[in-house]
Amino acid sequence: MKRRTARERAMQALYQMDITGELEPKVAVENTLDEGEETNEFLESLVVGFVENKEAIDEAIRQNLKKWKLERISIVDRSILRVAVYEMKYMEEIPHNVTINEAIEIAKTFGDEESRRFINGVLSNIKDTL
């Protein structure tokens, strides 16, 4: 599985967890996989890592939102931001610009017309604080 695919699956897993409020991370990951597709370490680390660091990640996002509340952001955008912020804060081997570019590309696919610019702005602000 390519890293872009893993990031997309991680966003989908966080989306499911946000909607249901009760899925276990590994179950959410399994629900995103195509039949016969196997998970990988990167995908699982994104989802489990977010769950383990949810408070710090959400706080980093909150501190960089202008005129928005985290709870008012679309679930898709919130999920993309959460995956990207986890990656930026806890996966130091991945350059921040790579993470931001990947999040923007995922937003183009899954978000609305404004998602790309919104996510770019929030993540750029967060990058400056790390």
Swiss-Prot record:
GO molecular function: RNA binding
Keyword Transcription: yes
SUPFAM superfamilies the UniProt entry points to: NusB-like
Source domain of life: Bacteria
Keyword RNA-binding applies: yes
Record key words, sorted: RNA-binding, Transcription, Transcription antitermination, Transcription regulation
Pfam families named among the record's database cross-references: NusB (PF01029)
GO cellular component: cytosol
Any GO BP annotation: DNA-templated transcription termination
InterPro entries in the cross-refs: NusB-like_sf (IPR035926), NusB_fam (IPR011605), NusB_RsmB_TIM44 (IPR006027)
Family (UniProt): Belongs to the NusB family.
Physiological role: Involved in transcription antitermination. Required for transcription of ribosomal RNA (rRNA) genes. Binds specifically to the boxA antiterminator sequence of the ribosomal RNA (rrn) operons.
Protein name (database record): Transcription antitermination protein NusB
Species of the source: Bacillus cereus (strain ATCC 14579 / DSM 31 / CCUG 7414 / JCM 2152 / NBRC 15305 / NCIMB 9373 / NCTC 2599 / NRRL B-3711)
Taxonomic lineage from the root: Bacteria, Bacillati, Bacillota, Bacilli, Bacillales
Gene from which this protein is expressed: nusB
